[in-house]
Amino acid sequence: MSDLKKAAQKAIELMDLTTLNDDDTDQKVIELCHKAKTPAGNTAAICIYPRFIPIARKTLNEMGCESIRIATVTNFPHGNDDIAIAVLETRAAVAYGADEVDVVFPYRALMAGNETVGFELVKACKEACGEGVLLKVIIESGVLQDPALIRKASELCIDAGADFIKTSTGKVPVNATIEAAEIMMTVISEKNTKVGFKPAGGVRDAAAAGEFLGLAARLLGDEWATPRTFRFGASSLLINLLHTLELGEAAKGPQGY
């Protein structure tokens, strides 16, 4: 198997197959569940809005795909600094049956010089997750832009108990970049290598996925990236990975997240 095909296979195993669109419906989420069971194996998870968790759980169970985890989003997409609302949303997501919660860090507050609210929000949301539910924190690196802010946000999230740090919501012009990934995974290497990393949005094909996986191997070791420590947040990426593996047609036209 070529390096490109190896990257494609690994990226599928590490994927949070995502739909977070305003026009999402039960039917679209059912279709997403079926896409997550690929000819190359199951994706790690699907990522959907909280209201669709029950239909997704029912569908995955009917498919015999209980191992595909269900992730959802809270404080999304704007990363507001109201801790109480973020906690209520996170509790509701867990009550719906989420296995993982992707919460948006209050990145604008950090840009304005407030480090405390982000730390406290992540800490409170981690407590709201309880046992067994992973908390992934989206720092919106493409808006932070400044390497010092990306580093600070990553440090605050890890110190507050995040299970993963994630680049992006996919709702802003700049999403996952190799530059941001290097800063974020460097912080993981310094602070706690049990914390995971999730590049989201903008990873378009096997070559790009391979670049992120190669960076992870260089910074954290060849064996580090597993579904417990590395995810790709993506929607259109899957089509291109299956094409690389000669298991489907390439994506046509402009593609989303």
UniProtKB/Swiss-Prot annotation:
Pathway where it operates: Carbohydrate degradation; 2-deoxy-D-ribose 1-phosphate degradation; D-glyceraldehyde 3-phosphate and acetaldehyde from 2-deoxy-alpha-D-ribose 1-phosphate: step 2/2
Keywords from the named record: Cytoplasm, Lyase, Schiff base
GO biological process, one term: carbohydrate catabolic process
InterPro entries the UniProt entry points to: Aldolase_TIM, DeoC, DeoC/FbaB/LacD_aldolase, DeoC_typeII
Main location: cytoplasm
Keyword Lipid biosynthesis attributed: no
Residues forming the catalytic site: D102, K166, K198
One cellular-component annotation, GO: cytoplasm
Reaction catalysis annotation: 2-deoxy-D-ribose 5-phosphate = D-glyceraldehyde 3-phosphate + acetaldehyde
GO MF term list: deoxyribose-phosphate aldolase activity
UniProt subcellular location: Cytoplasm
Top class in the EC scheme: lyase
EC code: 4.1.2.4
Pfam families cross-referenced by the UniProt entry: DeoC
UniProt xrefs under PANTHER family: DEOXYRIBOSE-PHOSPHATE ALDOLASE
Chain's role: Catalyzes a reversible aldol reaction between acetaldehyde and D-glyceraldehyde 3-phosphate to generate 2-deoxy-D-ribose 5-phosphate.
Protein family according to the UniProt entry: Belongs to the DeoC/FbaB aldolase family. DeoC type 2 subfamily.
Protein name, as recorded: Deoxyribose-phosphate aldolase
Species assigned in the record: Shewanella sediminis (strain HAW-EB3)
Gene name, Swiss-Prot/TrEMBL: deoC
